[in-house]
Amino acid sequence: MDFTNFYQLIAKSPLSHWLETLPAQLAGWQRESLHGHFKNWDRAVEYLPALEPETLDLLHGVTADSSQLTLRQRDGIEKLLRNLMPWRKGPFSLYGVNIDTEWRSDWKWDRVLPHISSLAGRTVLDVGCGSGYHMWRMLGAGARLVVGIDPMQLFLCQFEALRKLLGNDQRAHLLPLGIEQLPELKAFDTVFSMGVLYHRRSPLDHLHQLKNQLVSGGELVLETLVIDADDQQVLVPGERYAQMRNIYFIPSAGALKNWLEKCGFVNVRIVDHSFTSTDEQRRTSWMTSESLAEFLDPDDPTKTIEGYPAPLRAVLVATKP
């Protein structure tokens, strides 16, 4: 995996000081931390054709098409993309191959986009970006540069596969890092953290880490699980929540607003609440394991299988002074 293009891209940008540490960090990752299946995933990416779409739409979805592809080529693309399963965040429509992902991430984007500052010309960080679906939508909304970070290596390969099929667009780059591995860059106009906070053992530390990536006046877009309760309530689940082990703190939206203000954010707004439905998160032919339907109480879908409130998500927007 070659990150040279990204290094060259940021060399003359406000992110240039990241080059003091990042190349050595990623070289160490490639030497010491590769997943056992990484070579197989990387090979699938390598075998994919580098295509220049005749039609490309990142504004209303992530779709690309070309009249030049034969049915055999299309089938070959689908086979290689299926080698990168499971596909969790999407959907993608690529030359007649429709990747029906576990999550309808476009629905989340539709809930978020009306409430945030215009991304036109902005440098954006997407923390916990998955395979990068929202990164492409951020470009579609006018972002100048989008950097995604996610330590899951399958997501990196899925992202690079998409890049090959979307015309080798170099305005978006995914790095296999967690937020705690970033220096205090203070260089991003907008930082997104969507579906991450409840996985963090120390949520206030996470909020400070996000703040440290923003320029003064920059905007945080935070999307996470919440509970329907007063401003002082926080759920601390037992061993599992909706069958997930690594869930630590689920505050009410009001409590989360208080946390953001305690961390020094201003103009904190709760802009959306939405229950996750089994239409938004479900098993598909591109993600064949259990999904939300199996994680809810079969007799009472307002509760998880463990008896906690079913997943409710909120979007908050805040500003770094």
From Swiss-Prot:
Its EC number is 2.5.1.-. Signal peptide: none annotated. It is an enzyme of class 2 (transferase). Gene3D superfamilies: Vaccinia Virus protein VP39 (3.40.50.150). Keywords: Transferase, tRNA processing. Carboxy-S-adenosyl-L-methionine binds at residues 89, 103, 108, 128, 179-180, 194, 198, 313. This is tRNA U34 carboxymethyltransferase. It comes from Erwinia tasmaniensis (strain DSM 17950 / CFBP 7177 / CIP 109463 / NCPPB 4357 / Et1/99). The lineage of its organism: Bacteria, Pseudomonadati, Pseudomonadota, Gammaproteobacteria, Enterobacterales.
